Amino acid sequence: MTKGTPSQGRHNKGSNHIVCRRCGRRAYHVRKKACAACGFGKSTKIKRFAWKWKKVTGKGNRLK
């Protein structure tokens, strides 16, 4: 095993994100101890943004 640039490519074996206890998505960062999807570990409020869901207008097919 050599050191330097060739060895840096071998640092991608582990996974940074595991399944979140609160939202169930694979977005809980192990080292930061916070969920990127719902904000668990960072705040008590669930992280919500309007742009995450498609806006539906009228009486047509509703997205679930």
UniProtKB/Swiss-Prot annotation:
Organism: Methanococcus vannielii (strain ATCC 35089 / DSM 1224 / JCM 13029 / OCM 148 / SB)
HAMAP family attached to this UniProt entry: Ribosomal_eL37 (MF_00547)
Molecular functions per Gene Ontology: rRNA binding; structural constituent of ribosome; zinc ion binding
Zinc finger (C4-type): 20-38
Binding sites annotated in the UniProt record for Zn(2+): C20, C23, C35, C38
The record's free-text note on cofactor binding: Binds 1 zinc ion per subunit.
Disulfide bridges in this chain: none
InterPro entries named in the record: Ribosomal_eL37, Ribosomal_eL37/eL43, Ribosomal_eL37_CS, Ribosomal_zn-bd
Gene Ontology CC: ribonucleoprotein complex; ribosome
One of the GO biological process terms: translation
Known role: Binds to the 23S rRNA.
Cofactor needs: Zn(2+)
Designated name of the protein: Large ribosomal subunit protein eL37
PROSITE patterns cross-referenced by the UniProt entry: RIBOSOMAL_L37E (PS01077)
Keywords in alphabetical order: Metal-binding, Ribonucleoprotein, Ribosomal protein, RNA-binding, rRNA-binding, Zinc, Zinc-finger
Family note: Belongs to the eukaryotic ribosomal protein eL37 family.
Pfam name, any one: Ribosomal_L37e
